[in-house]
A protein has these predicted regions:
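Nucleotide-activated donor-binding/catalytic signature segment of Leloir-type glycosyltransferases, i.e.
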Residues: 60-68
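Short acidic/glycine-enriched loop/turn segments that link adjacent beta-strands
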Residues: 82, 157, 191-194
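Short beta-strand-to-loop capping motifs
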Residues: 90, 163-167, 200-202
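Active-site phosphate-binding strand-loop segment of PLP-dependent enzymes
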Residues: 1-52
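PLP-dependent aminotransferase class I/II
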Residues: 67-147, 151-154
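PLP-dependent enzyme catalytic core of the Aspartate aminotransferase-like
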Residues: 30, 175-180, 185, 189-220
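Conserved PLP-binding catalytic core of the aspartate aminotransferase-like
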Residues: 135-136, 147-180, 196
């Protein structure tokens, strides 16, 4: 959706995933600021699940806008998918409201073990930065290889890439990769039904993925 569509105002609320899923595309801070300015009368929630892989966080805008909530998960760049831990940033008027309803939204509250693990992950800055940098490097290397194979690869600021090939249907590639034990995401939706979303793994995993794709492309 074009950013201009989110700047019309008159909404009951605005939710923005930045970076977006499944494309991986990021919105720059000046565009997020425009969205906030255009929707002063409602809450703007920015979901930054993938922000640490190459996008700019809106967290620094929280002191300026009392209608902004920024949510982060520790499941991605902090490597804690199993603990289901996250947090929200906002001014007191919004965080107080979240505290009132949090147990109504999720009956399984964050337990002591998850809180301890989450706090430790937030303190370990060196591991976090090294992991995020490694994912980005592997992502760009994989994207370059896929472009050599003829794929369109959207610029990504997430831990996945969104790809399409002019001569191979995405659904056919999905099936071929599945037969080789390689799982990717395909979306049966208008406008994106000829694209695959490929999560970034280790260098070895991405080499295996590229080799499997190349083999499929050589088949008539």
């Amino acid at each position: 959706m074009p950013v201009a569509e989110l700047c019309r105002g008159g909404s009951g609320g605005v939710v923005v995933a930045n970076p977006n899923a499944p494309t991986g595309r990021a919105i720059e801070l000046h565009a997020l600021r425009a969205i906030l300015e255009s929707n002063r009368d409602c809450v703007v929630l920015v979901d930054e699940a993938y922000v640490d892989f190459g996008a700019q966080s809106a967290a620094g805008l929280v002191p300026e806008y009392d209608n902004l909530v920024v949510v982060h998960t520790l499941s991605k760049s902090r490597s804690l998918a199993g603990l289901r831990v996250g947090y929200a940033l906002g001014q007191p008027n919004l965080t107080a409201a979240l505290r009132c309803v949090r147990d109504s939204i999720n009956s399984y509250t964050v337990d002591r073990l998850a809180q301890t693990g989450g706090a430790a992950a937030m303190r370990d800055r060196a591991y976090f930065e090294a992991t995020a940098a490694k994912v980005q490097a592997t992502r760009e290397r994989t994207a370059a290889r896929l472009r050599e194979l003829g794929f369109t690869v959207y610029p990504s600021a997430a831990n996945f890439i969104f790809i399409s090939h002019p001569d191979r249907a995405a659904r056919a590639l999905l099936a071929g990769l599945r037969e080789k034990g390689v799982l990717v995401r395909w979306f049966d939706r208008p406008r994106i039904d000829n694209y695959l979303r490929v999560s970034i793994g280790t260098d070895e995993e991405m080499d295996a993925f590229c080799a499997a794709v190349q083999e499929l492309l050589t088949k008539t």
